[in-house]
């Protein structure tokens, strides 16, 4: 009986339609991040405390809520949807990191981190925070979780200021997270 219920809830979690607006916005962010020639951000002598706080603490809030809210509301379909979107985001992010590592566009290697290193694009931190916030806003309520929205640019800016990613990489990461939400999440029925 448990297997049938598991399979039934999994099948129910697959969306029957997707958000065309969210899909278009996410694809636009991905293309912008890959093809726009953003300037290299100079190395910062000091990083504002707000970005350290975001990097080490605040960016986890949406991710925790994206799992806690479906559990609290006993929303099995929502739990499957956030799991599906998270797995898809992780796979897409890491596959894209490896695929774009040696690609050069506008005289800039997409995989090169600001001050050395590989696998720059897309930013995994940006993709996961984008996924979590977009999931909560799409599945439950745009208005109810609007307060989480500032954590997205704060996380992106923290990654840039800490010299971990380029501007294009964080935009592409956000697009990847939103893309997976648009494909795997549907609004909760009242």
UniProtKB/Swiss-Prot annotation:
Keyword check for Transmembrane helix: yes
InterPro entries noted in UniProt: P_Acid_Pase_2/haloperoxi_sf (IPR036938), P_Acid_Pase_2/haloperoxidase (IPR000326)
Membrane topology: Multi-pass membrane protein
Superkingdom per UniProt: Bacteria
Co-factor note (free text): Does not require divalent cations.
Activity's dependence on pH: Optimum pH is 6.0, activity is seen from pH 5.5 to 8.0.
Role summary: Removes the 1-phosphate group from tetra- and probably hexaacylated lipid A species, has no requirement for the Kdo moiety of lipid A. Has no 4'-phosphatase activity. Has no activity on phospholipids (phosphatidylglycerol, phosphatidylethanolamine or cardiolipin). This enzyme has to act before EptA can attach phosphoethanolamine to the 1-position of lipid A.
TM annotation in the entry: 22-42, 60-80, 117-137, 145-162, 164-184
Name the record gives this protein: Lipid A 1-phosphatase
Keyword Hydrolase in annotation: yes
Gene disruption phenotype: Lipid A retains the 1-phosphate group; none of the lipid A species have the usual phosphoethanolamine residue at the 1-position as the enzyme responsible (EptA) cannot act on a phosphorylated residue. In strain 26695 95% is hexaacylated (16 to 18 carbons in length) with both 1- and 4'-phosphate groups, 5% is tetraacylated with only 1-phosphate. In 4 other strains (Cp20-84, Hp7-91, Hsp110-93 and J99) only the 1-phosphate tetraacylated species is seen.
GO molecular function ontology, one term from the record: phosphatase activity
Name of the gene encoding the protein in the UniProt record: lpxE
GO biological process, one term: lipopolysaccharide biosynthetic process
Pathway(s) per entry: Bacterial outer membrane biogenesis; LPS lipid A biosynthesis
